[in-house]
């Protein structure tokens, strides 16, 4: 009997424990619903599941079996619908009330409390105000919340010709250890006269942004980091949001870049950093390239050298620190792809697109550590941070100049049989300096520039040493300048600004003359101008460059900028003015549609002899639940052309009814929403070009892999547009041409062919 009672007691305890666990999970789910972000663990049986889950949500860390993850409400619901059973955990930012500092009595502040947002802003500005001989303060921009992306730039007042170095942190708002490390590092660089610090200030041009996601860090209040979350204010994981050389310009399938992302990309292109590091938390390891691809970086051995140096110096303080347990980890360092693959990381963008050696430093297992432990993390990382910066001074350095004038030039520095995937570097104006970190060895280094004779040198370099190799390139006489440029975006809505980037080459260019049809200003002599487009249309852009001898070259990109009226779905009717519209979901071009939507909208042409055409550039809704339907007429009583859901891009649709109208309905479910769609609205008939009216235009093969044939009659312009509306290939030909597509990522593109007989728009699929 006694044994029976004991058994009943044990069973009761087990049942109660199970019920309490269920209640705890329900309580956590309610908490996270209100917070807008879910934090959980998942156990996987097969390593292949890690990639599947990584595609569905944000994996923060994994030991190969247990995954620590974050998800926005959409991602979490999809994960559950896929059959996964996440174990919710208390959000790290809500485990305790953090100690905050309001900025008062700074003379006694010991870096053991998190600053309020206002204290952070005041501190950043005061660094420059109090130490103008070393520090300048600037802002990349102000977010909709009023919070800013703030930088301190530190040097000895003479930055020309020196390597540029970048430290950033906290692109995930709830990862605050690096935030505190960066603030304290700025303070030391501004105030210390230690010879090691003075050497860095004198020989580097240092940029530091302690917090690149302030909306995430101060999500609940400017007064506290309590409730900080990983994503930004728009529920975007900023470390999945960058262009990816393997997965395309927007691997997270969001149509437009967040301000935080675009501003950092602009900064990288403007300043051409030599080295960088981006601080995260959630693990303790240095994660080096690549994140997105199994191939090794060209400088893989160099990456192991500098990462081991960082981790080894941390181990001098504590052998258990910076030593993540993982089968692929090597004493505190790990290749990103071998850990777990992600697409759209900042690290991969900087290395591939910006010629900058950037590493990801995971500097604490705890997301928001107790602020009193910050001095400990400073001790662990201090020497390592300085050593990593000092590596920017090693390798091959020099200036590249014109052999006749001695003036600095922009040239490419490439290493034979070594460089690939963007590992080559370039020299920079105004000094013509270049900086090439590299592992010890003997290399064949080639220096080349348009209009100059290339030179190749055999250069030997040792680890942790610098070799100087100045180069003079001999100009090729009478080489004409070559104008070239690109735009930050080519498909925009009325009122948008577009930044243009000069890519011209030539001997001693002295002037740039831009013409912007339909833009304000209409002309510019700036190197990289910014233009506003206030009226709809398709506009040319022309650039004329002139060299010192007076030779000129003009490049005109016809129909380069497409400007449309913005038309978001709603209940009612719209008359398509100018036959140019960008059809968007209720969230606009950068937001998501909402839950429980039920819209019906009819779009009519301005003139009755025209018909509406819709071409989808991007499409993503919740499969089988959120549905966009299109009817050939002015109501839902008209014939149904099609209903679309999921990720497959709909074909081009043209109205055939006498009024030329299309009616759209959109219904969304009670949960899970995506960005929806982006589609151009144009017209047939009248003065507008018939988008399917070209007499002869044969495009094959479709799908294609490495090349595409276009056959037509006469002189023809063509443009190939990616899912963002960016022109990735363009050209002019007569009768026929072969277009090489080898360098383009797999995906769906829009091919526009314009000739004397009309225009043809066709969906093109590129496969790999």
Regions found by a protein language model. Give the residues of each.
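C-terminal outer-membrane/trafficking sorting elements
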Residues: 3, 511-513, 691-768
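Extracellular/lumenal mature domains of secreted and surface-exposed proteins
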Residues: 469-565
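Short, acidic Ser/Thr/Gly-rich low-complexity loop/linker segments typical of extracellular
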Residues: 407, 415-439
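Active-site/substrate-binding loop(s) of hydrolase catalytic cores
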Residues: 159-308, 312, 316, 320-323, ...
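Residue-level detector of functionally pivotal "anchor" positions at catalytic/ligand-binding pockets or at interdomain
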Residues: 404, 474-488, 564-574, 681-700
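A short, amphipathic beta-strand motif
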Residues: 396-403, 471
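A short, solvent-exposed beta-strand micro-motif common in secreted/extracellular proteins
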Residues: 440-451
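Domain-level representation of secreted and single-pass membrane ectodomains enriched
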Residues: 88-94, 496, 553-556, 564-687
